[in-house]
Amino acid sequence: MPKSSKKPLSILLVSDFFYPRIGGVEVHIFQLATSLIRLGCRVSVLAHHHKDRQGVRIMGNGIKVYFNQLISLHDDTSYPILYGCHKVLREIVIKDKIDIVHFHQGTSVTSLECVLHSRTLGLRLVYTDHSLFGFGDLAEVNINKVLRSVFSDVDQTISVSNIARDNLILRAMFNPYKTNVIPNGVDFTKFKPDKELQKKKNSKDITIISVSRQAYRKGTDLLIEVIPEVCKLFPNVKFVIGGDGPKKPLLENMIETSNLQDRVKLTGALHHNKVRDIMIKGNLYLNTSLTESFCIAIVEAASTGLYIVTTDVGGVGEVLPDNMVKLVNADKDSIIKGIKETIENYDNIKDNTNDFNEVLKDAYNWDKVAHKTIKVYHKAMMNLDRSIITRIKKVLAIGKISGIFHVCLIILDYLLLLFLTLYQPVKSFKKEKQFKYENYQKYLRNMK
């Protein structure tokens, strides 16, 4: 594996969302960290604690994880107390000699707080945006205001699609020249077709797979409308629905009222390692999302040999070649029409699905994603103007009231840093041995 010619960096990935929780952001951080380690970087993760996951853990692939124990809100996100993670962050930065703080997801409280503290500690900041947000309701307006304030401290941003990039620039009023587009990756060793099952597939018995969180944004309401209609049109069609969420009771009610217990199977929440086992049994993959910045699920499904029918929302249209996907409008009639046309033409489509994995493997390779991300890190390191005066000027440009409020937060943060420096000076920290990935790989080979 070729390594970067530049000095290896020490990276801290920050988010409320990380294993053992399962989701798009969690998988992204894990896979990115794994690939960065393979390329010679040192990687640590700061995440919110989850049940019994507390303190410091070293994962099998060499990722050092700090589970920060703070008060929890809904869905295991941290309660916002602004300065709650400053002390922990400073200790991590000193012990692991962090160069770059890379935070994920604008709705992560831990991420947003760490931006404030990281800049005070003199670190470079990179942000990856995983979601699209609108400008309509109060919650979206508020998060956009917060992002605009926070982004005055950010050196570079990464978006997973061009649509997501444009959305981020508009929401946060961020400098377009400091934004980068790097698509998500897929672990193609886990998502590959079953050749024997592929040979047996035909239009006589169609299984439609859909795996997502059962929530409004993921289009569960549309799915509930579409399933009974498709089952009426095609007696040979069955559905397998994976995932959990607040809309799951509505799905269960639809199955019962439409008497589809024999034709619609709900698997419930799935561990990421089990998703492929569900997908390989299907013919088509249906995505009914109302908003998506990328949609990694359709890449995973296509790589296992499924043809995709998906709503054309957000960055979905950028993800797959035309011969792998049918894009439809986000309404019941369009989705039903798309499924109908695909089923009627399935015997012709099926032959092409065997090559999907090889085509996608080159486009969405995690090592490529990591290489591109390292280039963004080096761009961030080139930002030399780190003075407090420049920082305050940027913050004041946000607006009178919000700017002054943010300046007060910054001043308090510097005072807290001064106190911590006196209370716990740098020389009081013990030197820690760095994890060496090469030695670990050698150990595993010897074990075999």
Task: Describe the predicted segments one by one.
Residues M1-R53, K64, D367, M382-K448:
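N-terminal subdomain of nucleotide-sugar transferases
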Residues Y307-T310:
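Short hydrophobic beta-strand element within catalytic cores of glycosyltransferases
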Residues D322-D333, T342-D347:
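Conserved acidic donor-binding segment of nucleotide-sugar-dependent glycosyltransferases
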Residues H49, I163, G185:
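Carbohydrate-associated surface elements
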Residues L290:
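Aromatic "clamp/platform" in nucleotide-sugar-dependent glycosyltransferases that forms part
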Residues A269-L270, D277-G282:
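Short alpha-helical donor nucleotide-sugar binding micro-motif in glycosyltransferases
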